[in-house]
Amino acid sequence: MDRLGSFSNDPSDKPPCRGCSSYLTEPYIKCAECGPPPFFLCLQCFTRGFEYKKHQSDHTYEIMTSDFPVLDPSWTAQEEMALLEAVMDCGFGNWQDVANQMCTKTKEECEKHYMKHFINNPLFASTLLNLKQAEAAKAADTAIPFHSADDPPRPAFDSLLSRDMAGYMPARADFIEEFDNYAEWDLRDIDFVEDDSDILHALKMAVVDIYHSRLKERQRRKKIIRDHGLVNLRKFRLMERRYPKEVQDLYETMRRFARIVGPVEHDKFIESHALEFELRREIKRLQEYRTAGITNFCSARTYDHLKKTREEERLKRTMLSEVLQYIQDSSACQQWLRRQADIDSGLSPSVLMASNSGRRSAPPLNLTGLPGTEKLNEKEKELCQVVRLVPGAYLEYKSALLNECHKQGGLRLAQARALIKIDVNKTRKIYDFLIREGYITKA
């Protein structure tokens, strides 16, 4: 390897002659008894019998030349090194420039020789890299979790979503209009010249320092927006709604302090209080069971069912107070009585209102050209058309419900309605669809 390492075409890559300090050209002499470091001499110094310190002219020597084959009888070692250097300089596959740099071989010969001896050569099949790959192949394959990542939103210019995102451009990671957008105007007339007085020079430097502080404030605001995920305001609000009302109030209060702490610390603080609220509510529920003398969850389910029944009976007993407000209007009173009769017969109020309104149902939504349509399968497209929900909003609602389901180990309809504040009928259809397709599970 030492011998091959000295076969470079560039004379400056070789060690100089110890006698005349000139660059060595092949053939040259290497002393077999001196070294390390190796002792090299050019032919002129060798023929003069040059001696230096411990080196004597009668030492055994070795003639260094690359005029011998290594891998192919028609290729010398010097040509092998020249080929590797040319591939390194010109790039793999650029065989015409490789041949031009070598000057002794055609591009076909260079490509054939390189592919045969350096790519497909079985001699290099037992390299350290291949051995590591073989050892890794013996190990059992482990599943790598894959989470699909949504592309950053790219709303059309001057659209509602673009205005909600403050003109943020995801491809450039920047805003169309910067914070303090006209800060550079204060510098447009400043010019440092040698004739400035000390006071004028200090004044100009103060203006530049103020400009730097404004730039720092601009970058600080950008960092807060990116770190806390405030670019997509709709998604941010959707994530906020997954908390109970009490935690949402705390979230709103603590939002102004988010810039002081990091995003992870802020989220941990909110999550810890959300967990505290859930624990307090669960403790209160268990205390209610204990007050009622219940000691197991089987009896607790019966207690909840009976409690719900009592609440429904209490509402029915108060219906008389409701009908009194319609007593002066006979048509309104008749309509109320029919509605109560239908409710008693098992019809839901939503079905009743739809049948009594007499209005035609809205036509299916046309999804052509709407952003996010290509990310939906056929069943999801049909759902969005029937529910009249744009694909972008559906994908956000779906992502929020999936995250909450994975976090809680299941999802109830009441939780879904608290999470996405839209029409309850649409929420029910989305919830039933995700349950039916296996995206989420019931709690």
UniProtKB/Swiss-Prot annotation:
GO molecular function annotation: DNA binding; transcription coactivator activity; zinc ion binding
SUPFAM superfamilies (alphabetical): Homeodomain-like, RING/U-box
InterPro entries linked to this entry: ADA2-like_ZZ, Ada2/TADA2, Homeodomain-like_sf, Myb_dom, SANT/Myb, SANT_dom, SWIRM, TADA2A_B-like_dom
Effect of mutating K426A: Reduces DNA binding
PTM sites of type Phosphoserine: S6
Residues annotated as binding Zn(2+) 2: C31, C34, H55, H59
Effect on the protein upon substituting R428A: Loss of nuclear localization. Reduces DNA binding
Pfam families: Myb_DNA-binding (PF00249), SWIRM (PF04433), TADA2A-like_3rd (PF22941), ZZ_ADA2 (PF25299)
Binding site for Zn(2+) 1: C17, C20, C42, C45
Cross-linked sites for Glycyl lysine isopeptide (Lys-Gly) (interchain with G-Cter in SUMO2): K132, K138
ZnF region ranges: ZZ-type: 12-69
Cross-referenced SMART domains: SANT
Record's keyword annotation contains Ubl conjugation: yes
Annotated Gene Ontology cellular component terms: ATAC complex; mitotic spindle; nucleus; SAGA complex
Subcellular location(s) per record: Nucleus; Chromosome
SWIRM domain boundaries: 356-443
Keyword terms, alphabetized: Chromosome, DNA-binding, Isopeptide bond, Metal-binding, Nucleus, Phosphoprotein, Transcription, Transcription regulation, Ubl conjugation, Zinc, Zinc-finger
DNA-binding region: 426-435
GO BP of this protein: chromatin organization; mitotic cell cycle; regulation of cell cycle; regulation of cell division; regulation of DNA-templated transcription; regulation of embryonic development; regulation of protein stability; regulation of transcription by RNA polymerase II
Subunit structure and binding partners: Interacts with GCN5. Interacts with NR3C1. Associated with the P/CAF protein in the PCAF complex. Component of the PCAF complex, at least composed of TADA2L/ADA2, TADA3L/ADA3, TAF5L/PAF65-beta, TAF6L/PAF65-alpha, TAF10/TAFII30, TAF12/TAFII20, TAF9/TAFII31 and TRRAP. Component of the ADA2A-containing complex (ATAC), composed of KAT14, KAT2A, TADA2L, TADA3L, ZZ3, MBIP, WDR5, YEATS2, CCDC101 and DR1. Interacts with CCDC134.
Protein known as: Transcriptional adapter 2-alpha
Gene that this sequence comes from: Tada2a
